[in-house]
Regions:
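C-terminal peripheral helix-coil segments that are non-catalytic and often amphipathic
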Residues: 1-3, 95-98, 128-140, 157, ...
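Helix-turn-helix
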Residues: 2, 14-18, 22-60, 64
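Residues at secondary-structure transition points
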Residues: 3-10, 14, 56, 60, ...
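Generic detection of well-ordered alpha-helical segments
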Residues: 9, 13, 17, 21, ...
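Hydrophobic alpha-helical connector segments
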Residues: 64, 78-104
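Amphipathic alpha-helical packing segments from all-alpha helical-bundle domains
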Residues: 71-74, 87, 91, 98, ...
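Secondary-structure edge/capping motif, primarily at the C-terminal ends of alpha-helices
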Residues: 80-81, 107-110, 165-169
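Amphipathic alpha-helical segments used for helix-helix packing
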Residues: 99-119, 132, 163
Length: 196
């Protein structure tokens, strides 16, 4: 049987994907500090050398994992926003909370990322830019700078609420309480955007 040989680019992409998958699983389950590059290499069925080749070091590998998670957030929020024209902020909150039910996602994005990559990174993240764009699109007269600041505030509030819900003894009750607050915040932003 004559099978087509994979190209160098295909092999590289597969290797990179295997490392990212292993890193995501281990960073998500054990956390950044308790995960070694040797474990990631073993989990991907490779030696440690490809990790250094493709990612440079552990921090850069973690940044790539975090970026993949951010892309997941943006894709999910974009798909959801199209279905929720009435109140996209509340809809985004619900969607984000669903993503945060995944313990790997929560550990990487909400717990380790701010500590490893720095909080200031959020200011330029695609998630914050999307939140600001949502505010500009749906919140009337809010100017660009106000939307950026509000976007960062919303991301911070959503992240903290998601952690609170996840750590609660009664997550369902905590989620309902957080959603009630999110409704009030969304309504207040709507009023503020119309008043400016």
């Amino acid at each position: 049987m004559n099978q087509r040989r994979r190209t160098q680019a295909e092999r590289r992409a597969e290797t990179r994907a295997a490392v990212l998958e292993s890193a995501c699983r281990l960073f998500g389950n054990k956390g950044y500090a308790d995960t070694s590059l040797d474990e990631i290499a073993a989990g991907s069925g490779l030696t440690i050398r490809p990790i250094y080749h493709y990612f440079g070091n552990k921090v850069q590998l973690f940044a790539a994992v975090n970026e993949a998670m951010e892309e997941r957030i943006v894709a999910s929020l974009q798909a959801n926003a199209a279905d929720a024209p009435k109140d996209p902020i509340l809809s985004a909150w619900r969607n984000f909370l669903e993503l945060c039910e995944d313990s790997e996602f929560r550990r990487i994005v909400l717990i380790d990322s701010p500590n490893i990559l720095g909080r200031e990174r959020w200011a330029e993240s695609p998630v914050t830019r999307m939140a600001a764009a949502l505010l500009l699109e749906y919140r009337g007269n809010m100017d660009q700078r106000s939307a950026e600041i509000a976007g960062r505030m919303i991301i911070g509030a959503l992240s903290e609420a998601a952690l609170t819900v996840a750590e609660s003894d009664d997550p369902a009750s905590a989620a309902r309480a957080a959603e009630a607050i999110a409704k009030r915040v969304s309504a207040a932003l709507l009023q503020a955007g119309q008043a400016e």
